[in-house]
């Protein structure tokens, strides 16, 4: 996701420069690891734990997140994104040496004198894992990864069905994404698919998951 994020930031900075309306760009990076929220850009520690609160209108907010900025150029943004990826939890799951063990939410906030103007969340989801393939290595992490993905699927299904209740609170991931996943918001999903036959079950599952997002 990092290269896509870098291109997105460059485009935002270009448009801000053209617009001349006083907009400023700020960046935060939050990791969802085993149902804990960690600030990957905290200046107070390598991975400070954060608290999720429910504010006005029942919308969620994160207390204490270090909002970095204003971002003046692409190089400063690139350095922050490199730091976030360096601090993100990775490990050997028996299939990949540096497998992502968490979900990463990179938030780009546009602000001006009047307050928040808009926000874009770039989410790098850890892939679902089959215990038969990984051999149970890092099992507790895999369980939480899959549980959060299942909760995200439930939220998408509820939005598709126009359900009265959308279960945002079933996981920290969906609660964190609630402000950008309400009806009327725009959601785009990019899927990384492997052409290898051995990865066919995971590829099929990823494409099926993306199909649900498209319907939502």
Kindly give the residue locations of the regions a language model identified.
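P-loop NTPase "switch/coupling" elements that transmit nucleotide state to mechanical/effector output
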Residues: 1-185, 192-195
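Conserved AAA+ ATPase "sensor/coupling" helix adjacent to the nucleotide-binding pocket
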Residues: 155-159, 206-213
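SF2 helicase/translocase ATPase core recognition
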Residues: 200-201
């Amino acid at each position: 996701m990092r290269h896509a994020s870098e291109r997105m930031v460059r485009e935002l900075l270009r448009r801000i420069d053209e617009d001349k309306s006083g907009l400023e760009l700020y960046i935060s990076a939050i990791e969802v690891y085993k149902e804990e929220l960690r600030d990957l850009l905290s200046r107070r520690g390598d991975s400070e734990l954060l608290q999720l609160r429910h504010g006005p209108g029942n919308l969620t907010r994160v207390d204490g997140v270090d909002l970095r900025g204003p971002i003046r150029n692409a190089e400063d943004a690139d350095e922050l994104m490199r730091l976030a990826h360096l601090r993100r939890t990775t490990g050997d799951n028996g299939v990949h040496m540096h497998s992502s063990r968490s979900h990463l939410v990179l938030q780009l906030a546009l602000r001006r004198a009047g307050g928040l103007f808009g926000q874009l969340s770039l989410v790098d989801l850890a892939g679902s894992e089959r215990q038969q393939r990984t051999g149970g290595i890092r099992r507790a992490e895999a369980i939480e990864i899959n549980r959060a993905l299942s909760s995200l699927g439930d939220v998408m299904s509820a939005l598709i069905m126009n359900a009265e209740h959308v279960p945002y609170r079933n996981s920290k991931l969906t609660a964190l994404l609630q402000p950008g996943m309400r009806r009327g918001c725009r959601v785009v999903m990019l899927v990384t698919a492997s052409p290898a036959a051995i990865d066919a079950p995971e590829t099929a599952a990823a494409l099926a998951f993306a199909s649900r997002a498209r319907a939502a």
